[in-house]
Amino acid sequence: MTIKTRFAPSPTGFLHVGGARTALYSWLYARANQGEFVLRIEDTDIERSTPEACAAILEGMEWLNLNWDEGPYYQTKRFDRYNEIIAQMLEQGTAYKCYCSRERIETMREEQAANGEQQKYDGCCRDKAPRDTDEPFVVRFKNPTEGSVVFDDHVRGRIEFANSTLDDLIIARTEGTPTYNFCVVVDDWDMGITCVVRGEDHINNTPRQINILKALGAPVPEYAHVAMILGDDGAKLSKRHGAVGVMQYRDDGFLPEALLNYLVRLGWSHGDQEVFSIEEMKQFFSLDDINKAASAFNTDKLIWLNQHYIKEMDPEYVASHLEWHMADQNIDTSNGPKLSEVVSALSERAKTLKELAASSRYFFEDFAEFEETAAKKHLRGVALEPLTLIQSKLAALNEWTLEAIHQAIEDTASELDVGMGKVGMPLRVAVTGAGMSPAVDLTLFLVGKARCEQRISKAIEFVANRVNS
């Protein structure tokens, strides 16, 4: 049997981290078993579903590289199929028309609550013949009243619900539109879904959906209900904890691999291993190893992973993601070094691509002023001689290579009989405008000869004016 899973978000908002983790687990289970992964947009809530939210979900999935084999399917384009099945169920007697008014239902629930009873439909119309009338009605599924629904959940083990506790679910509203719980069942059947991976908030829907599947003579898939994600304070995850849309993580400078690695470990583990490539995830992932307990979101851990991936991944690949941030910060990269070279130079310290982009600006454009603290410390009168000498040595270089630049700095320090820092630090501030950068020789090499000469001249003038003032 071919394993077939699905991710079925509702387009009422962005793709948040909880949804992304569910999608990842579902995707990994399919990929680990040479199966298929389906993307389905559950947009039956027409009032709350928006094209913008749908586009954001697709963009998030694509950015995470969670590719799908089928879809995206849209429930709103399948209403004819749902209505066909509803008509079939009415004819077979597994569903019925309910003419109870909203007022009657509300009164019934109030009485049940007052008596301490479970609030559920009392079956008033369950065994009545359909009326030849224009009265409004809903269609309800005729849920079994005896026995129980039992299923073995990959995460939670054996789960059982007594049928006597289950309502006769509404499967079509008064205006004729099918309901979420019904559409899900028909979709999973038609699409051949063999395993449903979703959040634990859907556990109570599962017995109802299983009963509908059995009434249709359809196979029942396996289930895996994953725990919710909490904030690091144990409260439900919210925006203040980092419960933002997936694309916000892109905007904040995270690599998709870092976010995926973080999400896969947020409830699943393989020994003590922390860092997983996508291939390792596929190799080791198992639904049965997902933790039952809720997991706490820790932004610091995500940042640590992101820093690791920026440092360890191919600079060309990191540069392909950095391009977006350079454009977002209005840094024109057409006049400067290759972006991959900048990544190699700056990746050791960068925590995010956003940070890396901001710290790379001096490679591509001139700065207006020297950083005050760095200038006060390193662009003093004693810097005038080393800056003047290194400028002449750099100007005399026939080849602008790392080795030649390094030798020029060494020769300057030797001739002046000073330590390398007495040359390197003023030179760094002169060329970058700040006191922090990669190795000075590498920095100069990437900035380029013409820019270096121009900036050193500017620094010499700055020091001279400071001395004379």
Curated annotation (Swiss-Prot):
**What residue intervals hold the motif 'KMSKS' region?**
236-240
Pfam families (UniProt xref): Anticodon_2, tRNA-synt_1c
EC number(s) recorded for this UniProt protein: 6.1.1.17
Which residues take part in binding ATP? Answer: K239
Classification via PROSITE patterns: AA_TRNA_LIGASE_I
The UniProt gene name for this protein comes to gltX
Which positions, given as ranges, span the membrane? none
Q: Where in the cell is it found?
A: Cytoplasm
Q: Which cofactor does the UniProt annotation name? A: Zn(2+)
- The protein's role, per its UniProt record: Catalyzes the attachment of glutamate to tRNA(Glu) in a two-step reaction: glutamate is first activated by ATP to form Glu-AMP and then transferred to the acceptor end of tRNA(Glu).
For this entry, the protein name equals Glutamate--tRNA ligase
What GO biological process terms are annotated to this protein in UniProt? glutamyl-tRNA aminoacylation
Q: List the disulfide bonds.
A: none
This protein's assembly is summarised as: Monomer.
Residue interval(s) of motif 'HIGH' region: 9-19
| Single GO cellular component term | cytosol
Question: To which species is this protein native?
Answer: Shewanella halifaxensis (strain HAW-EB4)
Q: Mind listing the UniProt keywords for this protein, alphabetically?
A: Aminoacyl-tRNA synthetase, ATP-binding, Cytoplasm, Ligase, Metal-binding, Nucleotide-binding, Protein biosynthesis, Zinc
Give the protein family. Belongs to the class-I aminoacyl-tRNA synthetase family. Glutamate--tRNA ligase type 1 subfamily.
- Which terms does the record give in the GO molecular function aspect? ATP binding; glutamate-tRNA ligase activity; tRNA binding; zinc ion binding
UniProt-listed SUPFAM superfamilies: An anticodon-binding domain of class I aminoacyl-tRNA synthetases (SSF48163), Nucleotidylyl transferase (SSF52374)
Q: In the record's cofactor note, how is the cofactor described as bound?
A: Binds 1 zinc ion per subunit.
Classify the main location.
cytoplasm
Catalytic activity field: tRNA(Glu) + L-glutamate + ATP = L-glutamyl-tRNA(Glu) + AMP + diphosphate
